[in-house]
Amino acid sequence: MSNQLNTMDIKEILKYLPHRYPFLLIDRVLDFTVGEHLHAIKNVTINEPFFQGHFPIQPVMPGVLILEAMAQATGLLAFKTMSTEPSPEVLYYFAGIDKARFKRVVEPGDQIHFHVKMIKERRGIGVFVGEALVDGELVCSAEIMCARREIKK
């Protein structure tokens, strides 16, 4: 667990998100307020597996993975807001995306800052808005929905 109550290191992130390499796309949470917002980062390196084919001559992070990382940040905020503790019986699924826009490419060496805000929650469905930024420049913005579901074993 992180030293500060409003941050999350990778060990705590792993308790909340079911994703693992190569699909865990959040490295650290810098700040969050339950029910309001979360600020997370992803450090993008040339060693990312997707750069082997997207694109070898001009490596660019796929937009769908930027959205997935934003959805993972949203999932962390949802867990922190709608659950008290992570549980292997509960997941937050990416349920929808609207108004996604891409403004700039993400390249090796970039650090993406994800800012997600909770708009509303009803019956386990959360609505969020998110932005991804590199060096203060907008990379991507979207509205994201996630749904809380219990896993039946």
From Swiss-Prot:
It catalyses: a (3R)-hydroxyacyl-[ACP] = a (2E)-enoyl-[ACP] + H2O. Its EC number is 4.2.1.59. It comes from the Bacteria. It holds the Pfam family FabA. GO terms for molecular function: (3R)-hydroxyacyl-[acyl-carrier-protein] dehydratase activity. It is found in: Cytoplasm. Its main location: cytoplasm. InterPro entries: FabA_FabZ, FabZ, HotDog_dom_sf. Keywords: Cytoplasm, Lipid A biosynthesis, Lipid biosynthesis, Lipid metabolism, Lyase. One of its GO terms (cellular component) is membrane. The active site is at H54. GO terms for biological process: fatty acid biosynthetic process; lipid A biosynthetic process. Belongs to the thioester dehydratase family. FabZ subfamily. Involved in unsaturated fatty acids biosynthesis. Catalyzes the dehydration of short chain beta-hydroxyacyl-ACPs and long chain saturated and unsaturated beta-hydroxyacyl-ACPs. This is 3-hydroxyacyl-[acyl-carrier-protein] dehydratase FabZ. It comes from Shewanella frigidimarina (strain NCIMB 400). The gene is fabZ.
